[in-house]
Amino acid sequence: MPEHLSPREILDRLVAFPTVSTDSNLALVDWVEAWLAGWGIASHRVYNAEGSKAALYASVGPDVPGGVILSGHTDVVPVEGQDWHSDPWTVIERDGRLYGRGVCDMKGFDALALAALPLALEAGVKRPLQIALSYDEELGCTGALPMIRAMAAGLPRAAAVIVGEPSMMKVVTGHKGGHSFRVHLRGHEVHSSILHEGVSAIMQGARLIDWANRMNAENAARPATELGALFYPHWTTLHVGTISGGTAENITAKDCSFGLGFRVVPGEDPLDWVARLKAEAARITAEMQAVHPDAGITLEEKFVVTPLVPEQDGAAEALARRLTGDNAVRVVSYGTEAGHFQSEGYSAVVCGPGDIAQAHQPDEWLAVDQFAAGWQFMQDVVKDLCR
């Protein structure tokens, strides 16, 4: 028998699962799968290599092309170290806001999308409504591509993808791409009084970080491209967020590692930036090995987030603008899974409830009126699919 749940009741269920990216999401997937099965809606899983996490997708309606995909992710960021004033795994409504980890990013949208499936079933849509729920979005959208490719192989191709990251229900047509590396440096230890006989992994790493700073300065000084001018900032940025290494102050560091990330403006080739990084690392490595042959630099690729490029006459943009009435041009500098959908041949935009400023914060919240606006959008999507 189907279990009739409101969007808010579904949100309560989803938030109760602590699906931090470092942990499994299978308990949540089990619940979603069982709830959909109660409505007679079949769902499909796409597991990670270890079988510890899964993406889930489902479809309601006839097996014809031209439908709509509602895309969200199941994982959330940790709450450790944050000062919460209520249980982060229980949705609390207070002063027109819904509080809880993931309510904004992005279980609020997930709940609305799930609630829309029985609505589409009962309405008898003429084109399918599909849902896509990924894992590891917060770790670099690493769970998205296998899911997207499975959907492309197993379902009729949708005309539009709505990725429901928080945008205040405004239509976002472009975002920067992301490329993340962990840089590992191997040095050669000697007493720091004879520094010239050793190789400090930290000091050599600082040279690569200085290169990143110089690239930022050069990029900022260049005039914006027509597409780049839409973004803030309008240039590709390089950033080092974490670093570790060394043994003692009087020993040249035998190791150093740091995270280096790119946010690439659409229109620039991310692989060109990778080539530049590799060339600079090779140049520094050669100088390190001139002192000691075992010294060097290894680049470990962590993830790639494909940029979302504004489309000419895109079906997803046309649908989202028609249903929201929003015709302003908007792009963002953070990444989403919309770029991956677009790279696989889908028309995609970002449009979802909530403000990105609330994502990842202690006492994360979603305005009740945004949740209501998102539900109205879902109802309008279903009506559109009935035409």
Model-derived regions, located:
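Acidic/histidine-rich catalytic neighborhood of metal-dependent amide-processing enzymes
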Residues: 106-180, 386
